Every structure is written in C-alpha cells, then in structure tokens.
Amino acid sequence: MNIGFKTRIYLGVGLLVTISLIVLGTLNILSMKEKMVTSLVNETQNKLSFHVTELEQLMQFRINAIATGAEQFDPSLSDADNQKLVNLLAKSTGISNVIMTYEDGRNYMSVESSNQFDFRTRDWYKTAKVASSVVLTDIYQDKVTGEKVVSATMPVKQGGQVVGVLLGDIQLGEIISTVSNMRFAGGAA
C-alpha cells in the first residue's frame, strides 16, 4: 500500500503529538505524585507536632497543679479540709488519684478505698521527700487503683521542713487512649 506525502506528514505529526502527550502526561503524574507525598508528609508532621505539644501541655498542666497544690496543704488543716483539697485537685485537673501523706502518717486520697496504707514506706514518698521540686516516677502498678500510672510527687514544706508529700497519679491508659485517638492522613496513631 502506497501512502501519499500528505498522509505521511499527518501520521508523523499525529505520532509526535501522541508521544508528546504521553511524555507530558507521565511527567505531570510523577510531579503530582511527588507533590502529594510531600504534602501528606508535611501535614502528618504538623499534626504530630500539634498532638505532641497537646500531650506535653496536658502533662505540664498536671505537674504544675501538683507543684502549686502542694503549697496549699498544711498539717494543721482539718481532716475534712485535707479531703476537700485532694478531691478538688483531682477533679479540677483530671488527675486520676491525688494523695496527700503527712509525716505523722495521716493520708488523704481522692479515690475512696477501704484499705489503710502507710505511704511513707513507698519509694515515691522517700524520693519526693528529699527533692526540691516535682519528681516524676517511673511507670508502676498503683496498689490503690490497680492501674499502671506515672506519678508526679512534690514535697510539702512548712518553714523549710518537709511535713509530707503530695502525689498525683496519671493513668498510663489515659495517655495511651489519647495517642490512639490521634488521627492522621491515611490512618490513626
């Protein structure tokens, strides 16, 4: 079959246009893919930074609440006043359990328990007693609630002398739940 000159030109131009469109389309797809991946990575990093900051602020708020709360306790307070203070501190900060233990053995908890405890023998009490500021414990199983917790402890001082220790339990399950509920592009944490 004989193809005329005009037909050859038309076929050549058509082939060049087709090849050009395929090459440009492929380059465009690759470019868009790169931009989408970069955008997705940036968005995920921004959300992660936001959530990390949010968790840090929550923890810092609770640590500061224990530090500030320790200034309110005094061995001369009545049992009712001590109990009101630990309950108020727990409810207003979202701390799962607040415990105030005095050197004379009295203790007040925001979580009701029929058991009597001598918290002065606990490692967290001994560590906080010699500290000058808030101390965070390692993760441990709380004997009162049975939950895994991290505790913020602060010595309570009167006239420069330690008269007790204030503790606030932060449940590990709450932190894990908060992290699990974080949503990112394409899934969850």
Regions found by a protein language model. Name each.
Residues 1-34:
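Extreme N-terminal signal-anchor transmembrane helix of membrane signaling/transducer proteins, especially
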Residues 9-15, 50-53, 106, 148-156:
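An N-terminal domain-start capping segment
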Residues 20-21, 37, 97, 104:
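Alpha-helical transmembrane segments of multi-pass membrane transport proteins
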Residues 42-135, 180-182:
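Extracytoplasmic/periplasmic sensory segments of membrane signal-transduction proteins
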Residues 108-187:
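Extracytoplasmic/periplasmic ligand-binding sensor regions of membrane-associated signaling proteins
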